[in-house]
């Protein structure tokens, strides 16, 4: 019984010891996370305060401390890289950032990968912090990486800051750095990745005297100084207070410089505002003038359009009237011609077209002259032949007689007849048609019997 009770007691003690180690480890991890997040918040505040007085660059101690803090946060409980032999080699947070921040639009991952003077992963991670601050996208990078929870779980162990609730606080704190203009040299000594980053906690440590304390801070410092060495006197405590006074004087001087700078900026902005107001007033006046011109142009265009529409309507009316007059004139002309000229059946058989007779008379005279000239020519030819060959004179006389007979009996074909009559009259056209239909004009009797003759 005693042995069993001792065994059970030892088991209970062993279990309690294991639980104590776990709780202690959890407490240490929580304290570590809280310390890093708190000091990061202080570092961001000091950076913002420092940026009001001077430009933040690689030589600024506030930035160097902030970069070390951020590097410690991103490296907190980072898993090692497993080799082929099963060993874990140390890994930099750049390996995680390179994978998790690929989705950021216009990211600088490829640019940092291609940098010639940066070779190690730690140096590339430090270069990424500087570039992200200059681009004012550090908060966006961290937020995008934290949203990729699967990748984050693959790179970090349980209890890491990026896997806890402190991660959201980290992204919110870094958002305030977007208001600061950073200027870094990516070829400096700060990118050396051979040494790990070390955090300086002294700027953020301040002793707060408790309410139960009896002595003041000065008396306690004097007592501690006298107990530490006999040579310590109250006079030796003076320099810190003088340093405080100097620090206040320096702060006052910086505030004065900041006030002067702000005053100059205020004057510049007022002058710029005055210039912009003048430009705005000129633009407004020009806009009014242009609007008035546009209104006048619209009015003129409307009036011109109305006038053109009125002219179009008037021209259409005139065209309609002209068309009606033309139609009426055609009808009157048709009626007049119909009433003036009788039908072909009503024409007198003895009626002869005057213009046809005149044409026949003119052609007859022309034919007579032509025949006379031909007779003379044939007579001369016959005389010449008779003189040359008397025996052939008789034969030539016979040919001459035959030629005369043919000329007398020749008919007038339509191809030799010109146009007769006037084409402006319907009756003349009818007379010409009758002439063509008869093919020849044999005698006046035939001409008078044609149906299309014009009255004399």
Curated annotation (Swiss-Prot):
Q: What is the species of this protein?
A: Pongo abelii (Sumatran orangutan)
Biased composition regions of type Polar residues, renumbered to the chain: 224-235, 382-405
Region Disordered, residue ranges: 1-24, 216-237, 382-411
Leader sequence range is none
Which PROSITE patterns does the record associate with it?
RUN
Q: Which residues fall in a coiled-coil region?
A: 300-325
Residue positions where Phosphoserine is found in the record: 215-216
What is an example of a Pfam family matching this protein?
A: RUN
> Gene3D superfamilies attached here?
1.20.58.900
Q: Which family does it belong to?
A: Belongs to the RUNDC3 family.
Spell out the subunit comment. Answer: Interacts with RAP2A.
Lineage top rank: taxon: Eukaryota
Which InterPro entries does the record associate with it? Run_dom, Run_dom_sf, RUN_RUNDC3B, RUNDC3A_B
Enumerate the spans annotated as RUN domain.
57-189
Name under which the protein is recorded: RUN domain-containing protein 3B
